Amino acid sequence: MDVIARYPEFSPLSLEAVQSIKVDLQQLHDGISELTFGSLYFFRNFYKYQISRFDEHTLLFLGEEQGRTFFFTIGAPLPVSTIKELYSSCAYWKLISESYLSNNQALFQNFKEPPTEDRDNFDYLYTRLSLSTLSGKQLHKKKNHVNGFLSNYPDFTLKKIDADTKKDASKILDIWATEQANLQETDYEAAQQALALPQITDFLSLILYVQGVPVAWCLAELAAQGTIAVVHFEKARTDFRGSYQYINYAFAQSLPEQVVYINREQDLGDEGLRHAKMSYKPEGFAKKYRLDKGAL
């Protein structure tokens, strides 16, 4: 029995459904952070994700944000008639990748307007080499933060997140949560979902300890046939100066050579976050496009 509903029916996105399409997600070339096992499953409640199988080559997803319903697809292009059906209940089509856009130009000629760049949701791409060395004048300040951490906290250890250490990651997450003004608008619940997942050892992860005290952690997964590491979560205690910079640096160093890029996800239009992400000098972006209902 298929764990995914058949179009026009949709079903809530379950762990079994995401597991059944995990291989398909890993084959996507653009490395878009939302189109990964972790992002779909961990944020399924936040976005109220639903899934449907249009045919053997195409999957459909529905979601909600800020009171508006959206859809996105994976696989072969949909008939225009089906897209119009989706727009009857959705405000926009999101997560259109650059490759989908270039490979389906004929499809988009059926609309009054072309898809537009969704800049607030561009994923930031950095080379593994850049983040694992922090060499060069542009990243000199970042390297100083790392060196400062090493000088201040020489008695540190790094471990993987597993059944024994994930309780320590939860402690860091809860301390981080106390510093958030609007916790329900953050990725706190999604991070809890991640740490509760029995298969957490299937992910790339690190947890940082100073004198046995857990101070930072990160969780990521491979995408784009193993060439991109998508960092879903990075949390640290701000009272341990340089812990954010060090976990970032140490994680990049821990990655296998097959990883070319590290995707540190989007800034969501937050100017402070944008400045922070730009300060690490991205190599480029995993661009995303959207098409609003008015383009019909």
What are these regions (language model features)?
Residues A163, K167-V230:
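A mid-sequence, solvent-exposed acidic-amphipathic segment
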Residues K94, K159, Y261-R264:
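Short catalytic-loop micro-motif centered on adjacent basic/acidic residues
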Residues N110-N182:
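Acyltransferase donor/substrate-recognition loop-hinge adjacent to the catalytic core
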Residues I83-S88, F149, N248-P256:
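A conserved short alpha-helix in the GNAT/GCN5 acetyltransferase fold that borders
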Residues R6-L35:
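Short Lys/Arg-enriched alpha/beta "domain-start" segment
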Residues V23, H29, S33-N103, Y209-T238:
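Conserved donor-binding loop and adjoining core beta-sheet/short helix segment
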Residues S205-G294:
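Aromatic (often tryptophan-rich) hydrophobic motifs at membrane interfaces
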Residues S102-T116, N144, L268-F285:
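Conserved active-site alpha-helix within GNAT-family acetyltransferase domains
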